[in-house]
A protein has these predicted regions:
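Anion-binding and metal-coordination hotspots
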Residues: 1-238
Length: 238
């Protein structure tokens, strides 16, 4: 059975300036880890005469910070209702340290949540639509190369009929090929024999998938045209 596929990027109904970038969030989290380490070093210096010491690591979990904040309150018998604020009030060392612990805990929870929403398969999402991923769509009505929140919609056609449709969060068509083939298999109980697709789908992982599941490899790889028709490339490949 011959199965052709193409992709469409549908812009999501989300604010196009509401992006969250996974890599930027991870960098911010590691900078926060450094601040937490510095804070624990200060607290350990403060508590050295008590024999109590908080463990210092390269990474921290929200649970550990929450436990540390509770322990710190217990050690100093802190009462938040007595905390001072505003001009003319000098905060105690204990109040400053405790407030920093709470601040860092809040930030760390925020970073962890953002990274979990992104998941392993994508690097961004929209604050107003967590299912949408920022990608370049084929037709940008703004006439520019701006990244927009969208969904990658895959359509498989067999004998001029739409056989399967799949909606993904992946920016690359390469990553959408295997989920689409598996969805086809779930519906019909077999894989299409001839999965015809353009070079955007050709990758080592997809070829291996075809080999393992009895599909003919009808997708060109991204450099196919250059490697087969470009004379300069053959003479100077590097």
């Amino acid at each position: 059975m011959k199965n052709d596929r193409d992709t469409l990027e549908f812009e999501a109904n989300a604010n196009k300036y509401s992006w969250v970038w996974k890599k930027a969030t991870e960098k911010s989290r590691y900078r926060l880890f450094e601040k937490i380490t510095s804070l624990f070093q200060e607290i350990n210096l403060e508590l050295q005469y008590t024999g109590i010491k908080f463990s210092i690591n390269t990474e921290y979990s929200p649970e550990y910070l929450k436990e540390a904040a509770s322990k710190y309150v217990e050690i100093w018998q802190l009462d938040e209702t007595t905390f001072v604020a505003g001009k003319g009030h000098r905060k105690s060392v204990q109040q400053r340290h405790y407030e920093k612990l709470k601040e860092y805990l809040s930030k760390l929870n925020d970073y962890v949540e953002k990274i979990q929403i992104c998941g392993d398969g994508r690097n961004s999402y929209s604050k107003t639509d967590h299912s949408a991923t920022f990608m370049r769509i084929k037709k940008d009505y703004m006439g520019n190369d701006q990244l927009l929140p969208a969904y990658n919609v895959q359509v498989g056609v067999a004998d001029e009929y739409i056989a399967v449709v799949d909606v993904n969060q992946y920016r690359s068509d390469m990553d959408c090929f295997i989920p689409l083939m598996n969805k086809f298999h779930d519906i019909y109980g077999f894989y299409p024999k001839y999965p015809v697709a353009d070079a955007g789908y050709g990758s080592y992982n997809n070829y291996i998938f075809c080999e393992q599941n009895g599909l003919e490899k009808y997708m060109k790889f991204p450099m196919f045209k250059k490697e087969t028709t470009d004379r300069n490339y053959h003479e100077y490949p590097f």
